[in-house]
Curated annotation (Swiss-Prot):
Nucleotide-binding as UniProt keyword: yes
Record-level Gene Ontology MF annotations: ATP binding; ATP hydrolysis activity; proton-transporting ATP synthase activity, rotational mechanism
Signal peptide interval: none
Keyword annotations: ATP synthesis, ATP-binding, CF(1), Chloroplast, Hydrogen ion transport, Ion transport, Membrane, Nucleotide-binding, Plastid, Thylakoid, Translocase, Transport
Protein name: ATP synthase subunit beta, chloroplastic
SMART domains in the cross-refs: AAA
Amino acid sequence: MRINPTTSGSGVSTLEKKNLGNITQIIGPVLDIAFPPGKMPNIYNALVVKDRDTVGQQINVTCEVQQLLGNNRVRAVAMSATDGLTRGMEVIDTGAPLSVPVGGTTLGRIFNVLGEPVDNLGPVDTRTTSPIHRSAPAFIQLDTKLSIFETGIKVVDLLAPYRRGGKIGLFGGAGVGKTVLIMELINNIAKAHGGVSVFGGVGERTRGGNDLYMEMKESGVINEQNIAESKVALVYGQMNEPPGARMRVGLTALTMAEYFRDVNEQDVLLFIDNIFRFVQAGSEVSALLGRMPSAVGYQPTLSTEMGTLQERITSTKEGSITSIQAVYVPADDLTDPAPATTFAHLDATTVLSRGLAAKGIYPAVDPLDSTSTMLQPRIVGEEHYETAQRVKQTLQRYKELQDIIAILGLDELSEEDRLTVARARKIERFLSQPFFVAEVFTGSPGKYVGLAETIRGFQLILSGELDGLPEQAFYLVGNIDEATAKAMNLEMESNLKK
């Protein structure tokens, strides 16, 4: 972090104006720039092109140095469109990496990758800024406390609980509900959370970003009357941005979160949607820089880039960052290098299944694929652990029996297996839940279910006390009492029809 010196009108200090270069080549978002001998900028330095195009329109493009090519030339990646740039244009070396505003001034506002506000609410105080490139906290600074982060979502809290100050990944292919789940987590956690939240929209739809902003304003997380009272900062680098912006916008959001953790000593929530787009942008940039592609066409530096980002998302003795990251899974293949590299960094993984989404079970979380390092008896307690294991065993047995059921039918199963199947189907439906953010789609009000209620509900199903209830009574309800009430209503309706 640094307190900025007084800058001249152009926003670049007079001292820094001395180091000027010229564009020698433009290949899409990649620029080659020649500098005077002995005046070469460092890797990651920000370069600024300020000029006018052929029709007199003002150009202001910021780039980041990626390679030193020799012969006093550098190769840089642009953070915005390079339309209108021509060879020979003057380039200013700012002498420092990209820096973005941090602290209370960021709350309630929407920023782009450069830390410029894009919400038409006026300028932001830029006296306190922080460079987006910095090293991860030292090993001795890390905090290792273990505690559960309750989300109010049954399937998550029971089977793959989240760690406070941990890293959580939501894995899923296209259209299975990653963004809806992340919005629900923002709704359930960020609203009740005393600290601040930072949302990084990395290479996703602009519409999704707009929906989230409106939702935040309606719920009061962003306070329109007094913007300083807001609880969230939003950083967007959407699908239409050049790869340089999509590759760096995650670091911009993380830098803002780190300031709240390190300087304000707060507990921070960091939401990133979508971490795969960060990898995808890195792959595009890597190809443009002329690097040899690695497995499945990804960049050879995939592990390094992911590690550099993920190791900064951590909890220290000053404060914590709990991060929830959506991870797109290309072609539903979890062995693809992008999701596979992400897995290694996470404390909990919530895997979304297309099969469950096709059945209409939302959230479509796969109870057998989702994992958490927190699901241990010494952390969650014996009762929670035992219930979770029995639920998984029942669902696993049902999965094993599905082939037999498909060929021979339910009647060929033993009495015990028939009972297991009936309970597994109830469990599967009871793992669904109406979301607050999906009220407009489902027509049913959202439900927050506490952990104790969740455990009680599944224990009742496993014990056999509810074997007499129809399985549709367990679909899209909150706690178990709602399921029994729904069963009574279904019975009354069927009696009336008779």
